[in-house]
């Protein structure tokens, strides 16, 4: 997809948000916008499953929020550079290649994307891992937030190189931590350890080849060469 196509897709996503919010925007626009997009909101420490072991006065501090935000963005950048864009020469090389041949803004916006089809596995991996990194770095996770990533845990665990027994144990540990009510410092610390262990497994696993068409072509050529031999 070209940059113009990405921009139009983002406009479409924003349009859906506007359409869904029309009843509230018409009746209470200021209240809706200020509450729906309140990025400075702090959830109640008592109900948090994540980072419950952190004392409340530090839990609600801006220092912790900023620290987690920096770790979140840094981890996303590291995964993008060394894992998701590895076969493109890294994130920065990929971005540079998009600007390198453009002589004007108009040419940059309208440039055609390369004819490369990403594999389904790569797309799902990037989306699930990116979401999981956000879960790991979330200061407060209430019980309903488990639905954000529960469905992706089996996929993520099987993207690691851990033995199957370890994968199952990690899945059970995460499930048990979320079923402790109310959460305790120990269950919260154990959940964070399990999350970090899974994240380490995802990081240490080899970067997959992202393109489906080239992979299929290579597989086909290898099969044909095998038959010829």
Label each residue range with its predicted role.
Residues 1-37, 41, 62-229:
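Multi-pass membrane glycosyltransferase architecture that uses lipid-linked
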């Amino acid at each position: 997809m070209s940059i113009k196509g990405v921009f139009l897709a983002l406009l479409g996503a924003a349009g859906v948000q506007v359409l869904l919010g029309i009843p509230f925007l018409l009746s209470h626009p200021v209240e809706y916008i200020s509450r729906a997009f309140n990025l400075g909101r702090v959830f109640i420490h008592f109900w948090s499953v994540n980072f419950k072991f952190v004392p409340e006065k530090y839990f609600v501090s801006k220092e912790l929020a900023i620290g987690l935000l920096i770790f979140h963005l840094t981890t996303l950048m590291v995964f993008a550079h060394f894992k998701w864009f590895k076969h493109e020469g890294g994130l920065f090389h990929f971005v540079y290649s998009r600007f390198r041949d453009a002589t004007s803004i108009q040419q940059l916006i309208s440039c055609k994307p390369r004819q490369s089809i990403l594999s389904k596995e790569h797309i799902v991996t990037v989306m699930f891992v990116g979401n999981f990194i956000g879960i790991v770095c979330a200061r407060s996770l209430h019980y309903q937030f488990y639905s954000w990533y529960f469905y992706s845990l089996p996929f993520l665990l099987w993207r690691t190189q851990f033995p199957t027994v370890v994968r199952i144990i990690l899945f059970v540990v995460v499930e048990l931590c979320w079923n402790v009510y109310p959460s305790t410092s120990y269950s919260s610390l154990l959940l964070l350890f399990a999350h970090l262990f899974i994240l380490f497994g995802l990081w240490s696993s080899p970067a997959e080849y992202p393109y489906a068409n080239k992979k299929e072509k290579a597989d086909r050529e290898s099969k044909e060469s095998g038959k010829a031999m």
